[in-house]
From Swiss-Prot:
It catalyses: 1-(5-phospho-beta-D-ribosyl)-5-[(5-phospho-beta-D-ribosylamino)methylideneamino]imidazole-4-carboxamide = 5-[(5-phospho-1-deoxy-D-ribulos-1-ylimino)methylamino]-1-(5-phospho-beta-D-ribosyl)imidazole-4-carboxamide. Its EC number is 5.3.1.16. Pathway: Amino-acid biosynthesis; L-histidine biosynthesis; L-histidine from 5-phospho-alpha-D-ribose 1-diphosphate: step 4/9. It comes from Pelodictyon phaeoclathratiforme (strain DSM 5477 / BU-1). The keyword 4Fe-4S does not apply. Transmembrane segments: none annotated. It comes from the Bacteria. It is found in: Cytoplasm. This is 1-(5-phosphoribosyl)-5-[(5-phosphoribosylamino)methylideneamino] imidazole-4-carboxamide isomerase.
Amino acid sequence: MLIIPAIDIKEGKCVRLTRGDFSQKKIYLDNPNDMAIIWRKQNAKMLHIVDLDAALTGEMVNFEKIREIVTNLDIPVQVGGGIRSADAVKRYLDIGVGRVVIGSAAVTNPKLVEELLHTYTSSQIVVGIDAENGIPKIKGWTESSMIQDYDLALQMKEMGIERIIYTDISRDGMMQGFGYESTRRFAERAGMKITASGGVTNAEDLHRLNELQPFGVDSVIIGKALYECNFPCQELWYNFEEEISLDHNFSTARKK
């Protein structure tokens, strides 16, 4: 089970939201690049970055912040948030982003996904489905779609998408555990590679999530629980906090 730390960027800062509510924003660091280096020092093998401003507006507001992170790291970075055009995808891939996450556009403009898969590989293009009660939400989770989450996944699968990032919005940022049943239901019906997201709070959640590997769930994105140091192994790192410098020497970690 690959654990992928999340970095959400709003107005240039590293933040976390609760259930995607922009009014419930907590700033963790002013510079997202510093946060990326800290996660790399803690042996992250991949990072998940979301441009929250772009998710609302469709404009690549934090592009330069993301470029800085990609330039400074030696691990794959996947990026999502407001990516609704082929040009946006190209710009991200051109700066070294390993994987681009298509969210709202998979609902509003599915032909874009089809076109992208003619140009790029299925490892570079994945679809993010952020669902509440089985209904995908779009445009920064401000609007509901008219399709079931698994139906959307099957449409994307038919086009050639191989991986879905599945978020149970009702659990995201709540620190109350992940949606085991909703994630299992979705994974069983989709029959695809699944990266789970939303609500993982502690090691027990990870053990339960591991039970879903037979259904294709092979990785998990974790945000607030990592920022709040909810895992015992993090205590070991922070006992040696002076050694977690913000340079680019990653000798303490190995690239997968």
